[in-house]
Amino acid sequence: SIHKIVRGENFADDPGLFNISGKKFNIPGYKMPKCKNAAGLFSENAMDIIDLFIGSEGILGVITEVEIGLAPKHASISVVKFFDTEIEAIDFTAYLKDSKDVMPDFIEYFNGSGLEMIREKAKKDPQSVSMPKISDNANAALFFDIEIKDNNINAAFNKLLSLNVDWKGSWCAWENIEKERIKNFRHALPETVNEYIAGVKKKHPSIHKLGTDFAVSDEKFGELVEFYDSVLNRSGLKYVSFGHIGDNHLHINFLPSNYDELEKGKEIYKVIAEKVIELNGSVSAEHGIGKLKHRYLEMMYGAEGVREMRRIKSVFDPHFLLNRGNMFPCGEL
């Protein structure tokens, strides 16, 4: 059957019951974490049915057409601030998020080992990076944008200066060509990680990328960062950390040089996932569960939570034909 789903037209009623084209069913009976989350099917009291389909990884139907609304693009200043230590960058993130004046559009983070990888790439192939030199003393960095309101660039700069921090060595851009150079910096690290893994695969063909996608609430982020540092530093494994720190969502990318290190990385991944779940966080804040993270979805929601997702799938796909193996193993309800 074909359903036209328009936001604002179909909500779950008080007991949590949906009725769409004669199909009646209750929303999933589990609570979602209070943080950025893309793990499993969305569920919330009085939810709009469109949110059940968004992020459902294709297990409920085939989306044939999407109509979206776009917010006007605003002028902005791009900033990269470097720090002597990673903890200074993390503390400054909290400071930025609490600011009533600056209110950045986003905040991205890069740890010390990540900056070192970019430095090495810039030395070997300066044109591929196309950005200013990173200070040798920098051990962490934040990248963020702030809006230029009413074309008043001076007012935007004054907001930055009101933060009363040392901006020495920072990068700042408002013209498009310079902002592109800063965007190159943003993408340089994940691209360099991919190049590293590709190089290792030449000797060890079954090596693959291993990275986390975890997130927690504001209140739990400091505890998770301390846990990251403790577990990762003890491991002796090479890794980089970067990502969406404004959402308490960092990607830890392991950089194995052989199969033993890859297996050790997988063990550490599981240990960190258990901690994230203990902190009521998400095992997949952005990329979804797919076919490889079934066990972590069940760890997060429990076996009953996964059964609830299967129940919802059976309403729209009773023979379990769509995207078999996505989110949970194949098989009927």
Feature names for model-found ranges:
Residues H294-L333:
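Activity-critical C-terminal alpha-helical subdomain
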Residues C35-F53, L232, K266-N280:
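Short, hydrophobic/aliphatic alpha-helical segments
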Residues I54-S56, V62-K266, L279:
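C-terminal substrate-recognition/cap domain of FAD-linked oxidoreductases
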Residues I277-I289, S314, P318-L322:
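Alpha-helix capping/hinge segments and adjacent helical runs
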Residues S1-D98:
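FAD-binding subdomain of flavoenzyme oxidoreductases
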Residues R181, I289-H294:
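Short, highly charged C-terminal tails/helix-capping segments
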Residues N253-D260, L292, Y296-M300:
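Conserved PLP-binding active-site segment of the aspartate aminotransferase-like
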